[in-house]
Amino acid sequence: MLLAIDVRNTHTTVGLISGSGDHAKVVQQWRIRTESEATADELALTIDGLIGEDSERLTGAVGLSTVPSVLHEVRLMLEQYWPSVPHVMIEPGVRTGIPLLVDNPKEVGADRIVNCLAAYHRFGTAAIVVDFGSSICVDVVSAKGEFLGGAIAPGVQVSSDAAAARSAALRRVELTRPRSVIGKNTVECMQSGALFGFAGLVDGLVNRIREDVAGFSGTDVAVVATGHTAPLVLPDVHTVAHYDRHLTLDGLRLVFERNRDGQRGRR
């Protein structure tokens, strides 16, 4: 059983993956709040409580974090609480198998890399990956499996919260689908702007990529979405053909499998 940990700015996804290669399957997944000051002991207490008896069945662990301080604590947690379990952390120097054709490869978030790796592995073609997180990342992988870059925009919830925080007349609202694109009250107006507005943003970016990037105008380009808020927005997005809830976890597994031989026997 592989333990996969995906730490983002606001939330952390913990998954258990059985099998490997084409037989791999995410059997459990949890989403918890990210605490930027959490210690290795606190992380271990939380994760051990989630995975329960499967803690004794772990054959490997893999993690990424967009929060540098948490990355260190996750590594420390694995070394202290599961010392006999080989683990891989996604960071510079780890083999991902995906060339980064950008100005500064070290700037590229680990989440973006593993998403593109998973998309290319699944479809075997050029792909556009849309990750609906605290930021919306629209990333591009070539037909050769190369990371070409992408676009980053504020996420749906982050933008809605920012609007409420900076305006005395607005308040934080629950992000649900409004009755119409034309809101009849302030809450519906904010919901409309968030949901339909970001659906248009995603369509605009995907269409622009198809127009501007050589080789991306054809039907053989896969467009896949992932992320917690994706199901909320995708019904109004016209350019995304696939949704994969486990895309990041699958990418983490792929990186672990590429690096596990060097991790065997690690103490």
Swiss-Prot record:
Q: Give this protein's Gene Ontology molecular function annotations.
A: ATP binding; metal ion binding; pantothenate kinase activity
Q: Its pathway?
A: Cofactor biosynthesis; coenzyme A biosynthesis; CoA from (R)-pantothenate: step 1/5
Q: List ligand-binding residues for substrate.
A: G109, A110, D111, R112, T186
Q: Where is the active site?
A: D111 (proton acceptor)
Name the needed cofactors. Answer: NH4(+); K(+)
The UniProt keyword set, sorted, is: ATP-binding, Coenzyme A biosynthesis, Cytoplasm, Kinase, Metal-binding, Nucleotide-binding, Potassium, Transferase
The protein's matches in InterPro entries, at most eight in alphabetical order, are given as: ATPase_NBD (IPR043129), Type_III_PanK (IPR004619)
Show the catalytic activity: (R)-pantothenate + ATP = (R)-4'-phosphopantothenate + ADP + H(+)
Where found?
A: Cytoplasm
Task: Relay the cofactor remark from the entry.
Answer: A monovalent cation. Ammonium or potassium.
Q: What is its EC number?
A: 2.7.1.33
Q: How does it assemble?
A: Homodimer.
Q: What does this protein do?
A: Catalyzes the phosphorylation of pantothenate (Pan), the first step in CoA biosynthesis.
> What name does UniProt use for this protein?
Type III pantothenate kinase
| Protein's organism | Mycobacterium sp. (strain KMS)
Q: What is the lineage of its organism?
A: Bacteria, Bacillati, Actinomycetota, Actinomycetes, Mycobacteriales
